[in-house]
UniProtKB/Swiss-Prot annotation:
The protein's name in its UniProt record: Uncharacterized glycosyltransferase MG060 homolog
GO molecular function: glycosyltransferase activity
Cross-referenced InterPro entries: Glyco_trans_2-like, Glycosyltransf_2, Nucleotide-diphossugar_trans
Entry keyword Transferase: yes
Pfam families: Glycos_transf_2
Signal peptide extent: none
Annotated family: Belongs to the glycosyltransferase 2 family.
Amino acid sequence: MKISVIISTYNCGALIVKALCSLVSNQTPACELEVLVIDDGSIDNTRQIIKKFQAKVSFTLKYFYKKNGNWGSVINYVKENRLANGDWITVLDSDDTLKPNTLNKLANLVEKADYDLVVFDYTKCWKKIKLKIHTYPTWWKNMTRELQKQTPFCIPLGKFLKRNLFYKLPKLKEKVSFQDALYTASSLKLAKKVRHVNQSGGNYHFKRAGNSMSIPWNIKRFSAELDICKDLIRLNAQEIALVHLLRQQFRVQLKEKQIQLAVTRDFNFSGFSWYTRCFLWMVYQTMLKRYFYLQTTKQ
């Protein structure tokens, strides 16, 4: 089985070493590893670091340099040039790492059943705090219903797509942030069979300087968040759009600009775990309901 790992990087030469080392420790006879480093216009020493690694590792490590266009442009670049040749494809940010044995666990799973998408839990790291995030309830394994497949934890880390699913994904927007949420939501919508693994597949470094979560709340960030919410609603994932409104600064600007988001159905949290369902229902009723309105369709 061949696995393609896409590493999106921009001026992260000091951090990408850990990401690459985590792949070295994941090598297994069950998997042929192909690593594609897509440099989104860095001006640091990323190229030199990758060149040194290419001489040391036993797996395929390719480096591509492109003009800066943000995260969505990296995925578009890989798809347009058909760079990922693995049976399974995943995306790893340059400041994140895979947990040991993740690829071996994946290989054992997909050998036994025909899945389109395998979703691991992950560990959220912030300063000295490490917290395991359960992407789905611990007892959920196989998801087929559309609303059941939704998850508010929509980073690409630990999500492995079959190659044909990856290349079916719609083109992402470029030169804007937060396209990873749309990437994940589109993957979940198109996947027929989703398998959840109740095991952390990697470490996600939250609010690292320079990543999208550390961007200040200016008009550009507000517009990007608003567009993502509208796109998620179009994907019938309005419950995930609602999660974006948990950010206070986003709500403040929506209120100032008197913006409401149109939805075409009532909110349904039945696909979430009971504790997430209770929390989202409560905050929707008490805080967030005012930011949405039900748009009736004409007969």
